[in-house]
Amino acid sequence: MKEIEYVQDLCSRAKKASKVLKQLSSSKKNKVLLSLADLLEKRKAEILLANELDLKDGKEKKLSSALMDRLLLNEKRIFSMASAVREIAALPDPIGEVTRGITLPNGLELVTRRVPLGVVMVIYESRPNVTIDVGALSFKSGNACILRGGSEAFYSNEILIKLFHEILIKEEIDIGSVVFVDKTDRSFMIPFFQQTSLIDIVVPRGGEGLIRFVSENSKIPVVKHDKGVCNLYIDQDADPEKVIPIVINSKVQRPGVCNSTENLILHNGYPFRKELLEALAKEGVELLLDPSSLALYPNGKPVKEQDYLEEFLDLRLSVKTVSSLEEALAFIEKTSSGHTEAIVTEDLNTARIFTNSLDSAALFINCSTRFHDGGEFGLGAEVGISTGKLHVRGPMGLVHLTTTTTYVTGNGQIRG
């Protein structure tokens, strides 16, 4: 089958399924999701076997430890996937929600309700759990989805889609509701981006190269899950009891994800900078240090200006020393990708200036950047974290997979 025929076949299947999905009852959708959660746990052995194939390929390709961690599925992560699906099932169904109701002076009755977007295409890398998260969110919100995962997670994604399809078949629902792109060659992606009548939105989540590729080639609206160059500023008035736990968690807990801190900004008036750097080194973090920090911790490496713009997704951290809040804010303006910025301070006025001066999807005070996540925000899961400003910003959850239709009821009115 030629590329264009393959693409149009998948897109047409999704479009057809979307017409049925928008009419499914909440109870039917929830039944499917709860059955899927149970099946993920029941068939975990099959999932782990498929994941082992991906991990084996990853080792042969010499993927970094952080990327291997993103790829890894274990029993705990499978149960976590199942739990996320149950959380999505428990969320209120946004479809049909009335966002506005009004009777006009001429007697016309206007009711605006939430409706599905239609067909959502998501392109992602490495993390197999995205397959389930996005599939479940799309299904619950009445959307068909086209999922194109990275080649490094092919076998894991394949088995997860298979299990989803088993449930759909059992419940007599079109498997076009969740479409899997089983071609990993990038040349197969471009024809998808031309299907303006069949796909309603494209969501790329991955590295800078993927985001640029999709943005430059798509004729379909794109919601970008761009790179996470997250900045964490330690103010001179930061509480030392909070600093080390927050910084360690922000960098070390899962370095291979987009809400991990990449730039640590230290006010030179903070008295425990050396202890903080030593604590990070003890956790295995490779420190890229400016001259001031290097003087405190000579075992680090000199930082390059380009490092401050990098999303490492690894146990590497760039450090910048500043002498004022204004200098910290100027640095963040130059380096931020618009994802997450955080401050640790006990000065409420400093915190207020920090948050009022910056323009990112999330701004945190005295807590880890790792909290910028759909699950942590109470959304159940997320399609991605949008760093753009149109359609949605921040975690893209159920409600963000909807648009609105206004229903107007009259009694013979005409416009004068």
UniProtKB/Swiss-Prot annotation:
Q: What role is this protein assigned?
A: Catalyzes the NADPH-dependent reduction of L-glutamate 5-phosphate into L-glutamate 5-semialdehyde and phosphate. The product spontaneously undergoes cyclization to form 1-pyrroline-5-carboxylate.
Annotated pathway, please? Amino-acid biosynthesis; L-proline biosynthesis; L-glutamate 5-semialdehyde from L-glutamate: step 2/2
Q: Which NCBIfam families match?
A: PRK00197.1 (NF001221), proA (TIGR00407)
Native species: Leptospira interrogans serogroup Icterohaemorrhagiae serovar Lai (strain 56601)
Q: What class of enzyme is it?
A: oxidoreductase
InterPro entries from the UniProt entry: Ald_DH/histidinol_DH, Ald_DH_C, Ald_DH_N, Aldehyde_DH_dom, G-glutamylP_reductase_CS, Glu-5-SA_DH, GPR_dom
Q: What is this protein's name?
A: Gamma-glutamyl phosphate reductase
Looking up Gene3D superfamilies in the UniProt record yields: Aldehyde Dehydrogenase, Chain A, domain 1, Aldehyde Dehydrogenase, Chain A, domain 2
